[in-house]
Amino acid sequence: MALEDHRFPCDNCGSDLRFDPGDERLVCDHCGNVEIIEHGPWTQSRAIAELDFEAALKALPDDPVMEVTRVSHCPNCGARVEFDPDLHATECPFCATPVVTDTGPSRQIKPRAVLPFALEEKEAREAMTEWLGALWFAPNGLQEYARKGRRLSGIYTPCWTFDADTKSSYNGARGIVYYEDHKVVRNGRHEIRRVAKVRWTPASGRVARFFDDVLIVASEALPKRFRSGIANWDLTRLEPYLPEYLAGFRAEAYTVELEQAFREARGVMDRQILRDVKFDIGGDRQRV
C-alpha cells in the first residue's frame, strides 16, 4: 500500500496550497491563486459512508478502508501527528517537545468524514486573547506566547463515532415512598417522627433506543478532563472526508484503537439505557 500524499502544489507557482476556512477553498499565500476543491459537498452531494464495526476490526493492511501515512510520535505526551514528507524535525503541537519525525509508514483506518475548520487564524487569535483576558490567572507561558504574536497552528483531532440500534429487556422493582409516624421520647418529651418507607413491587419490561454518532475522542495527547470538553462537536456540519481539508493544517493520528473506543462508547450507551429503564419502571425509586 502506497504512502498517502496530502500535499497540494499551486498550479501557478508550485507553492503549497492551504485550506481557507472562510471560503472553503484552497488558496496560495505566495501568489494568491485560488482553487476550488473538486467534488466537494458544495458541488456534489455525497453521503458520509459508515463502516461496519466487525468489518473494520478485520480490515487487512491492504484493505480500501486503510491508509498509510507518515506519523511522528511525541516521547513526552504520546501524541501521534502527521507531518509533511519533507519535514524531518519539528516540535509537538501539544506540548512543544522537540520531535524528530518518523520516516516509517503508519497504517490506520482512513477517515470517513471531517469537520472543517470554520475560523481563520485571525479570528482564533482574537478568541484566544478574549479568553485570556477573562481569566484571573493564566499560565505565564501562554500569556507570553500570545504577547509575542506567534502563529497559531490548527490541528485536526481524531474521533470515533458509533451507531447502535439497541433493544434491552429488564427485571427490576418499582419503589413507592410512603411515611409512617413513630412516637419517640427525646429529652423527656414525646414527639412524633415521620419515617420514610419504600414499598417495592416487581417490574419488568423492554426498552429500545437508537444511538446515532456516539462520539469518542481518539486522542490521548490531552488530559481526559480537556478531552471531554472538546467532544461536543456539531456533527451536522460533517463533510465527507477529502484530504484537501487538511491542506495547511496538521492532523493527529488516533492513539485510541477502535476496540478501546467501542468499550468507551458502550459505557456511554449503557448509562443511557439504565436511565431509560429507570424511567420505564417509574415510581419514586428503582432497582434494576
Annotate the PLM regions.
Residues M1-D16:
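Generic start-of-chain signal for non-secretory N-termini
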Residues M1-D5, I37-T69, T103-E130:
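Intrinsically disordered, low-complexity segments
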Residues C10-C13, C28-C31, C74-C77, C92-C95:
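Short cysteine-rich clusters marking metal-coordination/redox-active sites
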Residues G14-D16, V34, A79-R80, P98:
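Cys/His-rich metal-chelating microdomains
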